[in-house]
Amino acid sequence: PEASYTLEEYFRKNFDPGIMALFTGELGFSEEEIEGEFRFWQDWVRTRIPVAYPGIREILQRHKEAGGRIAVVSHSMRENIERDYRENDLPEPDVIFGWEQPPEQRKPNTWPLEQIMERFGLEPQELLVVDDLKPGYDMARAAGVPFAAAGWANDIPEIEQFMRKNCDHYCKQVSDLARLLEAGDLPSACRRLMVCACEDVGLAYPQIIPIVKAAVDIA
């Protein structure tokens, strides 16, 4: 009862060290107190549906239509995630790993990403984790998966500074994520260029292949 935080202070602590580390470390919650916090949280979200950021639905729809997968790794409960996606008319996720998982299978543990890769036959570089908090970043880094920071979630300078410095991609606006998914990262773009040079343009103009190869190496 003697501890109090402003909303911005809470955001900082939720970012790092994360919610459970805050509860068990700085606040020293007992198991009973953590269970009470969980019940309070569930009562709160039961009657409150968050509204998706403008543009998110269109991004997810295009991603699915292009053959992409949507996986949710969250500290929310699966039933709440399914409801929120449904109420916001978002594409149904292909897989969800929520708070109902045992602690050792929640982020920042890499278990959810390992399951996603195994289920869909993907390599780490074929995934992209999009998150606004450090536990998601830590999970992606430990699994060798590219990470894009959802910078539109807050305007806290320390968080933005960390994300810009350490993440593969920093998306300040939702539209930045749209551009990232449509354009791809640099290695992917270079691979596409080499395929075009060798299989398409190269058939008619073989001399283009070493030119493109040199440009790709520089990039």
Q: Could you tell me what each predicted segment is?
A:
Residues 1-57, 65-66, 213:
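N-terminal helical cap/lid subdomain that shapes the substrate entry/recognition surface
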Residues 10-11, 50, 72, 126-128:
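Residue-level marker of alpha-helix boundaries and capping positions
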Residues 37-38, 59-88, 97-99:
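Substrate-recognition element of Asp-dependent hydrolases with the DxDx(T/V) motif
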Residues 46-47, 70, 104-107:
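A generic structural signal for short coil/turn motifs at secondary-structure boundaries
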Residues 52, 73, 105:
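Residue-level marker of regulatory loop/turn positions in helix-turn-helix DNA-binding domains and
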Residues 78, 82-219:
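Asp-based, Mg2+/Mn2+-dependent phosphohydrolase catalytic module
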